[in-house]
Amino acid sequence: MKKLLIAFCFSLLASGMQAQADTTLQGSVRYLLTHNWTKKMAAVDYLSQQSRERIAYMWGKRSEWKEYTTLYFSPAVSRYEESEERAEADDMGYSWRREPLSLRRDFDKGSLSDYITMASKTYWVEDTLVPQHWKIHNDLKEVAGHVCMKATWEDTLKKQKVVAWFAQDIPLQAGPERFCGLPGLILEADLNDGALLISADRIIMRRMGKELDHPKKIKAKKVKEEQYTQAIRKYMDERRKEEEPYFWGMRY
């Protein structure tokens, strides 16, 4: 009887600790995305000088564009989407059309479920979750008030070098865009030396509910990860032939 009582006490303690962890490790992150068109263009190796000059003329002096995104997270699940908040005034006379984006990770089940748009076509990618193969470094820096450790990964399909910074004091695998799999919440990601900088600027810890679920009624073509990768490769090949930047029709 005494052993059962001790076991029960330990069970209550463990449950209490788990409940506390579930509460304290839930919340949302607002990320500021800074797109640098000049650096994005420089990373596209197939454009002729004439194409570069034409595109540079079209964009004029506006080399940067900023937007907000939001990541909702818990120990088991995360979901990432574009934010309703505006990061800057739209001084070009029109608003950017928001396309369906909802990237969901279930870390307990090891699965992903992503609604993502490419070339005006929305895909519903459902498959096993395979995180990026990160290399962790000893470098440290502060992001949004948290001491973060550096990790790197190279996207060989899009030819992007990614530098991520993850918070060791928030031991979750989640991150912005399709990044995940580090031993801490990813608070910053730098793609191709500033071509796209994703940086957390607000973290709110609170219990999550329906925020972790996909929005309803998203029309999309259901595919596996490999099929989506093939679609990316095909689209990039088409853009190469047309001498147009691939990132105009898909997420960078």
What are these regions, as identified by a protein language model?
Residues 1-24, 250-252:
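Bacterial Sec-dependent N-terminal signal peptides
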Residues 21-252:
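Extended soluble regions of mature proteins
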